[in-house]
């Protein structure tokens, strides 16, 4: 793993930051966030800041907007607030031009994302979620890159019915999106049942502790009575206040040696430190990771997280709240493009940030403990845990759980399995599904159903290590195809790899339709990031375990050029690699692409260093 710590100097927190040069960190702010809407406007804060303050704890005009049946949309401001409730307003971009030509409103619908800490659901919950998919969401359920489910295509008139059904499963969508702590991920390694149980519990505890306390969700979507009557001033958000966070905040819990949650790509992380019996003795805390950037703006960049320090188990929740509240108070509320925690740490320095976290916890953090990750992929097929239970990981392309004509019947098959399954289901950060906690005597029944419905226990090495975001046609930010394009590209690349004898070599490849990085392409050995229709930036050189960022190798590569661009590199890799050397490490050692030290260095020395 690369060393992400800043270089301290004798005269204070001036650092030689790769790609920026020697500079001195800014002095951290001492004032608390502005809590009055007019004052926020006068101070030049981003529009979302005074919108949040004036929203009545995330109510805004949502209740009234749902009653406007002449449109399938809600207002632009409510479109920002509804994110905190777990939704994005979208439209079908495949037919947008046609509808505009006919002078029709866009084909609006909503994406709904659930909050499922650790990605664990019971068979009963699965059946309810399946019924929602078939009733309101086009008979499809999507496992996300952050261990939860999304529904696409839910129209406005069905939103409250959908939310009521989700509530009946004892689940919700609160804080699945928006400027809050979002769904908390947890390690799913089935071979370490004891450590996983502790990681899952920490994820749930963090999710509950950092959950917004507003009653707006139940009031708006379930017609619940207002939790606090009278004026808004009577209702409080004890952790967030009226302003919530400057930007999204993502938290994960990892258990080495597997980094399937991609801990270095998140704002806050906890790495389990295990003894020789796989018992959790404490947690290394990581801070400041994040993927999103903006094309052409060098002051935006992905960043891998720093290891802040070590905490005892009893201090983990305090550390989580302390890290998040420092970001609440120090984060940039004027420029949302520079509002994530990664930029806060770049502005004020890791040492100043650590000191403030320690102040809020009330004690010093310990020195980080050693740990090792061996990859960020899933373990496919059957695995027996250290508790004697059995777990089957299924490969679900891009997480899309639906019945495919002439192919796997994911929706129907998993429904049948849920009807007989005695354990639970676990989503992975790689968009796959684990049929978990199966008694030994039930394996044959599960196997028979998997075979009957053509469910996939695995695929080629490349496909097993691939991910794609949704992109077109529903995502409003997509510049290029991703989920719909990746399968065809993988087929081409599989042929190329096979020609060079690399068909069994695990190489991570991820695709996103825009640079926001939902599928975490910048820590993938091969990363494709949409630039325009059928055009992508091609990134290479990330670490196989997700601990090092990639580097831009080729700009604006067309879809038809990608395989031809990579084939000579595959040939060189097959010929000149060292034993056990991963592709991302090879392209750096062989001099094809520069190594990225961390975020500010991401945009430096881009392009091929030599011809392949």
UniProtKB/Swiss-Prot annotation:
InterPro entries: CysI, NiRdtase/SiRdtase_haem-b_fer, Nit/Sulf_reduc_fer-like_dom_sf, NO2/SO3_Rdtase_4Fe4S_dom, NO2/SO3_Rdtase_4Fe4S_prot, NO2/SO3_Rdtase_4Fe4S_sf, NO2/SO3_Rdtase_FeS/sirohaem_BS. It comes from the Bacteria. GO terms for cellular component: sulfite reductase complex (NADPH). Its cofactor is siroheme; [4Fe-4S] cluster. It catalyses: hydrogen sulfide + 3 NADP(+) + 3 H2O = sulfite + 3 NADPH + 4 H(+). Its EC number is 1.8.1.2. Gene3D superfamilies: Sulfite Reductase Hemoprotein, domain 1. GO terms for molecular function: 4 iron, 4 sulfur cluster binding; heme binding; metal ion binding; NADP binding; sulfite reductase (ferredoxin) activity; sulfite reductase (NADPH) activity. Belongs to the nitrite and sulfite reductase 4Fe-4S domain family. Component of the sulfite reductase complex that catalyzes the 6-electron reduction of sulfite to sulfide. This is one of several activities required for the biosynthesis of L-cysteine from sulfate. This is Sulfite reductase [NADPH] hemoprotein beta-component. It comes from Methylorubrum extorquens (strain CM4 / NCIMB 13688) (Methylobacterium extorquens).
């Amino acid at each position: 793993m690369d060393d992400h710590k800043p270089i301290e100097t004798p005269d204070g927190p001036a650092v030689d930051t790769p790609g920026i040069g020697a500079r001195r960190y800014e002095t951290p702010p001492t004032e608390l966030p502005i809590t009055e809407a007019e004052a926020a406007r006068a101070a030049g804060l981003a529009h979302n800041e005074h919108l949040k303050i004036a929203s009545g704890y995330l109510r805004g005009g949502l209740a009234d907007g749902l009653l406007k049946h002449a449109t399938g949309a809600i207002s632009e401001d409510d479109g920002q607030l509804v994110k905190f409730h777990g939704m994005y307003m979208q439209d079908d971009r495949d037919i947008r031009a046609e509808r505009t030509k006919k002078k029709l409103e866009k084909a609006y619908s909503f994406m709904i994302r659930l909050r499922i800490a650790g990605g664990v659901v019971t068979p009963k919950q699965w059946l309810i979620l399946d019924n929602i998919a078939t009733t309101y969401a086009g008979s499809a359920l999507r496992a996300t890159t952050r261990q939860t489910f999304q529904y696409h295509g839910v129209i406005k008139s069905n939103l409250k019915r959908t939310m009521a059904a989700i509530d009946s499963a004892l689940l919700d969508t609160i804080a699945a999106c928006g400027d809050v702590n979002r769904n908390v991920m947890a390690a799913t390694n089935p071979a370490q049942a004891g450590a996983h149980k502790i990681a899952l519990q920490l994820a749930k505890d963090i999710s509950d502790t950092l959950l917004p306390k507003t009653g707006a969700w139940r009031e708006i979507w379930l017609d619940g009575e207002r939790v606090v009557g009278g004026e808004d001033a009577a209702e409080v958000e004890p952790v967030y206040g009226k302003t919530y966070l400057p930007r999204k905040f993502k938290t994960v819990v990892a258990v080495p040696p597997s980094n399937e949650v991609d801990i270095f790509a998140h704002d806050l992380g906890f790495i389990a430190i295990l003894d020789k019996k796989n018992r959790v003795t404490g947690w290394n805390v990581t801070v400041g990771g994040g993927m999103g950037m903006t094309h052409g703006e060098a002051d935006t960049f992905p960043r891998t997280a720093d290891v802040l320090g070590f905490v005892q188990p009893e201090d983990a929740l305090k550390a989580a709240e302390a890290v998040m509240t420092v970001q609440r108070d120090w984060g940039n509320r004027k420029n949302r493009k520079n509002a994530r925690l990664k930029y806060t740490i770049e502005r004020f320095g890791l040492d100043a940030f650590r000191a403030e976290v320690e102040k809020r916890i009330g004690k010093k953090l310990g020195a980080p403990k050693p740990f090792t990750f061996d990859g960020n992929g899933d373990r496919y097929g059957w695995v027996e845990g250290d508790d004697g239970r059995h777990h089957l990981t299924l490969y679900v392309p891009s997480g899309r759980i639906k019945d495919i004509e002439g192919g796997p019947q994911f929706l129907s098959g998993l429904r049948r399995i849920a009807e007989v399954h005695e354990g639970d289901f676990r989503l992975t950060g790689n968009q796959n599904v684990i049929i978990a906690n199966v008694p030994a005597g039930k394996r044959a029944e599960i196997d028979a159903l998997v075979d009957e419905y053509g469910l996939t226990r695995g695929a080629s090495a490349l496909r097993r290590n691939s991910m794609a975001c949704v992109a077109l046609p529903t995502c409003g930010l997509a510049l290029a195809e991703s989920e719909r394009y990746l399968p065809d590209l993988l087929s081409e690349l599989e042929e190329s790899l096979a020609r060079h004898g690399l068909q069994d070599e695990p190489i991570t490849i991820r695709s996103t339709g825009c640079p926001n990085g939902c599928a975490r392409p910048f820590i993938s050995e091969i990363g494709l990031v949409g630039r325009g229709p059928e055009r992508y930036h091609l990134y290479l050189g990330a670490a196989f375990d997700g601990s090092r960022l990639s580097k831009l190798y080729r700009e604006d590569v067309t879809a038809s050029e990608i395989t031809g661009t990579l084939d000579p590199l595959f040939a060189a890799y097959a010929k000149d690699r060292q034993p056990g050397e991963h592709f991302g490490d090879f392209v750096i050692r062989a001099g094809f692409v520069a190594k990225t030290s961390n975020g500010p260095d991401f945009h430096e020395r881009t392009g091929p260093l030599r011809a392949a």
